[in-house]
Curated annotation (Swiss-Prot):
Alphabetical GO biological process terms: selenocysteine biosynthetic process; seryl-tRNA aminoacylation
Classification via Gene3D superfamilies: Bira Bifunctional Protein, Domain 2, Serine-tRNA synthetase, tRNA binding domain
Organism: Methylobacterium nodulans (strain LMG 21967 / CNCM I-2342 / ORS 2060)
Domain characteristics, as noted in the entry: Consists of two distinct domains, a catalytic core and a N-terminal extension that is involved in tRNA binding.
Protein name: Serine--tRNA ligase
Binding-site residues for L-serine, renumbered to this chain: T240, A241, E242, E294, S394
GO-annotated molecular function: ATP binding; serine-tRNA ligase activity
Enzyme class: ligase
Amino acid sequence: MHDIRVIRENPAAFDEGLAKRGLEPLSAELIALDDARKAAISAAQGAQERRNALSKEIGAAKKAKDEARAQDLMAEVARLKDEAPALEAAADAAAKALDARLAAIPNTPKAEVPLGRDEHDNVEYRRFEGRGRAEAGRQHFELGEATGLMDFEAAAKLSGARFVVLKGHLARLERALGQFMLDLHTTEHGYTEVAPPLLVRDEVMFGTAQLPKFRDDQFAAMPGSVEAEGGAPTRWLIPTAEVPLTNLVRESILSEDELPLRFTALTPCFRAEAGAAGRDTRGMLRQHQFTKVELVSVTTPEQSDEEHERMLASAEAVLKKLDLPYRVVTLCTGDMGFASQKTYDIEVWLPGQGTFREISSCSVCGDFQARRMDARFRRREGRGVAHVHTLNGSGVAVGRALIAVMENYQNPDGSVTVPSALVPYMGGITRIEGPHA
């Protein structure tokens, strides 16, 4: 969420940032809301100060035995007391109106982010050729269904569209990928493993900016009794472990010496994919439930840019060790996520589609999420308290890594060679094949 004080100090810069995202200027509207908030607070405080002053005058009038004046003053105090709840409610409503408007506005991009409208304007940052890009091959779902180890029909009977049942060695390969990634990030990249809850509160989803903007993309979980009565949801299934990991520092004041903090988690993720109708309808690319290793960093403002590059390198290391070809692109202003100041996407090569597809997204959010969470740190040597910066990235999406391994390591007979980095996690299995695997 944006700081209204910063907007007031430089409204033109704020509007320029919005324009880069294709949005109309909003500084004047926000400043007007803030003026209304200040006026409402001033009115409530002024009435309270007047009551306090009149109370002293009542005492003086009684001391002077001026009963008539004392009665008049007491009547005025009573009137002000009656008006106080309405004035306080008006001040509260004005503050909430400003906060609600600020909460609906996306983060503004860093100066170096390329201008653009959509994914076609993203800029390649670097690439890794790995084992080389095969120009043709079967898609993952063709390979999976041929082996009998990837069952979309069974999943549809259980849960509907956009789910999958993995079996045998293919299920083990997905598990191996997740464990491999966690081990890499915790032993080589300095991340602390966390096993977070998968159900979180409204305020936690608000903190990372999933709510209120992306409410329709989420799955709400509620007790059956509440659902039957038409009540409001009490918990949300996490769309990414970014949500609980980032909120570990909500409503806290850290010491500068604690930073940076680095967390990682392997969790299921749940997304309604409300805007994905007709896209990637076959296969595992776009699922309502998928597994992902998440990376989250909490830093000082001075550390966040360097940490962004470090996080990107950590995610890239997964694909390098798997020898998978990929490229990194810097997202343009029109393609960035709501909370992001700058985002790198890692796109892995999929021979079955003959194209690169996103497998990781690494973003720096500045203090945008920290303000929503009230997450701060105390600077050394008494230099005050400031909001932390937050970063998040996929390290990486396990289901899409499985797709990439299947398509890049496929053999002419339809079997899949297990990458050497995963063989220890597969109990020595080097090839996945056949309906009985």
